[in-house]
Amino acid sequence: MALDKIRLIASYERKIIRRHLSFWIFLICIVFGIAGVQWYLQVDSPVWAESALSATVPYMNAWFFNLLQSLLVIFVGVEFVWRDRRLGTNETFLSRSETNVEYMFGKIWGVMKLCLLLNLVSIGIAIMIHLLFMETVAFKPLLYLFYLFTLTFPALVFVFGISLFAAMLIRNYYLALLLLMIGFIGSYFATPWVLYGTFDPWARSLPLLFSDAIGFANIGILLLHRLAYFFCGIGLIFLSVLLVKRMDDRRSAFRKVLGILASGFILLGIFAGALYLNTYLDINQRRVRFRIAQEKYMKSDRVQVVSNRMVYKQSGDRLHVESFLLLVNKSKQSIDTPILYLNPGLSIVSLTSEEQELFYNREGHVVVIKRRMECGEELPLRVEYEGIIDEAICYLELPDEEYHDTRMGILPLSADPLGNMPKTRHELYSNGGRFAHVGNKYTILLPECLWYLSAVPPVNLQIPSMKDFDFTDYRLEVEGQESKTVISQGSMKKNEKGISYSNDHPLPRLSLCIGDYEQKTITVDSLSFGVYYFPGHDFWTEGYNLSPDSSRLLMSYHLGVLERQTGNSLPVNRLSIVEMPLNFRPYLRQGQLGSNFVQPELVFFPEKLFTESYRSIKDILKLLKTKRSLDSEVEGVALRSNVLNRFFEPIYNIMPMYQEFRTTIYSDKFPCIGDLIYEIRFSGQSKDHLSLNEKVKTIQYWDGRSLRGALMDRDNPVEYIMLKKKREHINSLIATRVEMMYMWDFIEDFVKCHPFQRVDFDVFAREFKDQFNVNIDSLLERYYADDRLPTLFVQDLKMESYNGIPLGSCKVYNPSNIDGVLRVDGYDQKLRRQRPNYFLIPAKSCKEIRVRNYTIPNFAVELGLCCNLPDKIWY
């Protein structure tokens, strides 16, 4: 095979292609279209995600080029076969002695070289935009090469190969072009999420964004996917060469070798694709086994871990932990086989109690200890384990498709100076895929991955919204990481062996993060507020010019705003924001506030706030339409919109720190009872305003479904806002018997009397009855079972004066078979302010209600969760 002939044919083919109008149309689209789109979307974009990371510019360039390149290759691949058949544009070569292999290789190399040159031109323009107009975005030239070789080049080879093969088989030009375009459109829109992107040559479902902390997520799986399409593309190109009928070279030895190579490459591609798909299927099978094992031991009485001292070491992606635990049987009966949970990828080296080896069985993440524990008995354990974290254990309640979904959840599009954050969905970037990471460069371990022994699984598979914790006295010693920043809960101390963390009180969860972090800390009143970020990611303080004292005053003021919004001071003396790699995805469990990004004393933010909105001081000055406002005003807006407002967003909501991270109230009889009780405590702090469609949806959901049934419905999980409305309704019914304000004080006192404990609801119910002489247990029994909503008729709303006192009044009739409730704000003479009044409207009854009201003419009646629309009536 003569290389000079191949180069000559390739040169001639490029000249022919450049003469076509379609080529220049594609060239304009590639050069000006992609550049224009990137300029519009990324230069001075209000969407922070477009310019936050070093990978977004090269990735967007590769993404759009892949799309246009595929269209170009389809047209060119079909056309050059058609030209040879009909137009005779290559008669110069067709009449010569070049073999079919030389001739086709020349034409193919000509097309591919032209596409590669166009790709380099597109990359060059993107680099110019990156360097000249996006100076704040880190420039990493190797990322452009990475996307060239892993994203655009394999797609070029595959699409060109399948286009040639189709053109050789289908002799009609228009039919071949039509079928290829239908296949392109169909695969483009239908295949990204089918079988985890196995049939998507553009790899849009794979997490291809680069993290400065850990690089690419699942790089091995990514390379398998790209090799599969590259090998299949090479094989199809070789097969297309064999189908050329220009010369009879069937006896050529190289032709036979080419046939073997074609078959071999296609088989290699299929094998790589099968390995890629099998990776996901194997994870799914393991998750099924983990679910079966957990449900098998779900109903067993459990022990509690009251203390856990750990010595942590790691080497590469393997960790080694020596754990000293104290188990206590606080149940009302003996436990034959105490159950603990540990990541299934971690093997137990030894398990002893007071130097006596204990026998145990393991089923996935379930550790069954063969040692009977009597009621009230304590059992000290020493457990040594090591291995590699298996991330398949995380979020067992999720269906496989959702677990493997790598798309970047909900992205706030922009944030105005007041902190309002309209939201949209970003479909271009896929960043997820990781739930834990252990490595020499970076380590992050959250409780979800069971990196330490626990008596409670991460999720209750029967009722995913049900939260249960053991408040444990954790002591953590990390050895061999003196050169890194080690982050965990508690007070840090350095010693000869390494870094240790201890806590002043028991914690419900423990996290560990090790990496190259920079840190800024400020002490405000008694709170130590810290920010940990990766080197070069100090965009938090960009443009801030306040002195430390002024910053402390500003922070104190906004923490006071936070306290007023929650009605309570922050119940921790340390709060840190920790930057984590962009490859990690937060999940909001059914009916819960705060994701796995919210841990005791720690709130994890994604790398450079990539998935969120961010406003720099410069951006806020533009929005305020001024060159420079008062420093405190502008920087206060930045602090509120970029940090503090996020503490009330679902993913980063810190309400668990005020609620179950302080005291967990649990009950097997009343699932999620702790959430309902804390709903009472914080009911006066915020209101959720639903649209008409949301109200209709809420009514349709609850009319015919009980709270207990909704919590246990795994096929149709209840949304958080719907669950919140149901809890508010039940709390309103309870408030008809006990003043809401008195219940607020009672719950706060109860939490203070049982700090950092797991408390049985029976204790709460007993103290509640002692305080108010109300059997809340019997009330909840009925309210948990109610599966209908009342219908209320309200009439004769009016304001009148009685002895100079303004009164609001109305008449209410409840014709339904279930009790209803009305809320009317009235004036409290003792408190000298408005307060809510709750009135029970029993089934099949009517009432006339009068309340003292000094907010003339704003007399309003709220009907709670019922079949009425509107659910609030004004006078």
Predicted segments, located by residue:
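Juxtacatalytic substrate-recognition/specificity segment
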Residues: S45-P46, E50-T56, N90, R362, ...
